Amino acid sequence: MVGNWKMNNTIAESVDLATAIAEKVGADGVQCEVGIAPTFPALYEVCKVIEWSGIRLCAQNCHYESDGPFTGEVSTRMLAAAGCSYVILGHSERRQLFGETNATVNLKVKKALAEGLSVILCVGETLDERERGVTGQIVTAQVVEGLIDVTDISKLVIAYEPVWAIGTGKTATKEQAQEVHALIRAKVTELYGQKAADHLRIQYGGSVKPSNAAELFAMPDIDGGLIGGASLNADDFMAIVEAAG
């Protein structure tokens, strides 16, 4: 269960929120793996306040080179040095707003895995694509092309986030989400075999709230969540975490 804070919170606000979540995780004894993804400037300070709790520090993006003339970018080795163990790649906002392609995402995935980071690979269709009936084609292409030349997926998580449900208040029904998650797992089975697919965790993201989390997480192929807006409130985020059992 990962909270993606996106471009929200100052360093001080991030530390306060992380502290509140860490205290709740420690007190509640949660059964699932929990991560939070603050902004880049807050990573190091947040790391200090969660390192005792078992919460994973996640980054929201990375570059596919280790160093160099890439103004405004952050490399995987810098993220690792800041305490990150996960990085979110291919989020729909990166694809839609910043023009990231499957090929670019693939370069980042390979770099992050090579540097020892775990990767949350985001996939999902737009409203237009869903209405045209090509959801399966779009999502499986994002999976296949995002994983070109990746031979080991033991440190991979895939997050299905229908673009039309992110930040809109709309949520895929549990049946819609399960259908796509099953497609993803079937494609991974085809690419990497049944054992790897069975061990793969597939998250759902897209307006997950305390009120709908339990029914989503009850689906057989939904293994967790990538939570946006609700993760900015410690109580709401923990209610979702607890819904995952």
Curated annotation (Swiss-Prot):
Pathway: Carbohydrate biosynthesis; gluconeogenesis; Carbohydrate degradation; glycolysis; D-glyceraldehyde 3-phosphate from glycerone phosphate: step 1/1. GO terms for cellular component: cytosol. The keyword Isomerase applies. The active site is at H91, E161. It is an enzyme of class 5 (isomerase). It catalyses: D-glyceraldehyde 3-phosphate = dihydroxyacetone phosphate. GO terms for molecular function: triose-phosphate isomerase activity. Keywords: Cytoplasm, Gluconeogenesis, Glycolysis, Isomerase. Its EC number is 5.3.1.1. It holds the Pfam family TIM. It is found in: Cytoplasm. This is Triosephosphate isomerase. It comes from Chlorobaculum tepidum (strain ATCC 49652 / DSM 12025 / NBRC 103806 / TLS). The lineage of its organism: Bacteria, Pseudomonadati, Chlorobiota, Chlorobiia, Chlorobiales. The gene is tpiA.
